[in-house]
A protein has these predicted regions:
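Non-catalytic helical/linker scaffolds that mediate oligomerization, partner binding
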Residues: 1-317
Length: 317
């Protein structure tokens, strides 16, 4: 099996990366939504120094995110939030598509707001579920299709650098159909990197429904449960994960399970029983890869989390 961590402040030193590798980590993910390869040459040097064989880059793709904030915002239930001109920066296509009454999930659903006024340049919202809103956090609108390009200008720039930086795989968020995969294949070819593997992230209903058409075109499918859980009632997510796993097994395409595998270990040294059961069952379902995100990028126990992930998964093999 393959075991991935995500690089971030909690593990961005050679000693911790070596410890993660010793714990069984086979590769590492770099989230390019928070800065490109050119901005993270220090991380690339650390990854090489630690001898980590696989480097996955997670592109921006058609994902919706707010822009940068001067400082985090504390949103309180019943309060207001403006998205767009004169407020929190957000993609113009989102402002154009959203309508009165739409509910927007922010930061993987941790925060929830409802549109109370939709203008040409901004959305005024009421906060239904508050919390701390930080820069570059995700936005999802269940049931709404927002027309976004497959690859951003930053994505294309990062793909040009990918081979020279030792990238072995590219994760494409919010895959909607085979055209997204074909666009990425073409961009990799034009960058002189046709050998780099493609990981298709399933994060919305369009991706779920289109899976059969693009399965033959990808190297691995990523069942990304964060945003996928925003696209449906949470109690429907386990069934969806099982169905995606079965489809990948039937097609002979490897798949990865990711998001909140050991979320409690961001702040606790010991996982919950539910978390280790989740890992074990993902392996029984046939997962070829498992990945930690915030647990290694920002958590207090990155190495311990990787040890739990690897030991639990290997017990299931």
């Amino acid at each position: 099996m393959h075991f991935y961590g995500t690089i971030g402040p909690a593990c961005a030193d050679a000693a911790t990366l070596r410890s993660l590798k010793a714990a069984g980590m086979t590769g590492i993910r770099m989230n390019l939504s928070h800065g490109g390869l050119a901005q993270h040459t220090d991380w690339l040097d650390l990854i090489r120094e630690a001898g980590i064989p696989e480097l996955l880059i997670d592109l921006q793709g058609p994902e919706l995110r707010i822009g940068g904030l001067a400082q985090p915002l504390t949103l309180k239930a019943g309060g207001t939030l403006r998205l767009g001109q004169g407020g929190v920066p957000c993609p113009a296509p989102l402002v154009a598509a959203a309508r009165l009454g739409h509910q927007l999930l922010l930061d993987d659903g941790r925060l929830l707001v409802q549109v109370t006024a939709a203008g040409p340049d901004a959305l005024d919202c009421t906060v239904l579920r508050g919390g701390l809103l930080e820069s570059r956090k995700s936005v999802a609108v269940p049931g709404l299709t927002v027309d976004m390009p497959t690859l951003t200008a930053d994505d294309l720039e990062n793909l040009q650098m990918a081979a020279a930086c030792g990238v072995t795989g590219v994760m494409l968020p919010f895959v909607r159909g085979k055209q997204d995969i074909l666009a990425l294949r073409q961009a990799l070819a034009e960058a002189g990197a046709p050998h780099i593997r493609i990981f298709a992230k399933i994060e919305n209903l369009a991706g779920v429904q289109a899976l059969p058409e693009f399965l033959p075109l990808v190297d691995e499918v990523v069942i990304a449960r964060g945003d996928l859980g925003n696209a449906m009632p949470l109690w429907a997510l386990p069934r969806c994960q099982k169905q995606l796993s079965a489809a990948c097994r039937a097609a002979g395409v490897p798949f990865m399970v990711v998001t909140q595998m050991l979320d409690s270990m961001q702040t606790r040294a010991v996982p919950t029983r539910a978390e280790v059961s989740d890992i074990y069952n993902a392996v029984l379902d046939g997962a070829a890869s498992l990945m930690l995100t915030g647990e290694t990028a920002a958590g207090q126990y990155p190495v311990q989390a990787m040890e739990v992930l690897v030991r639990t998964a290997r017990t299931a093999l």
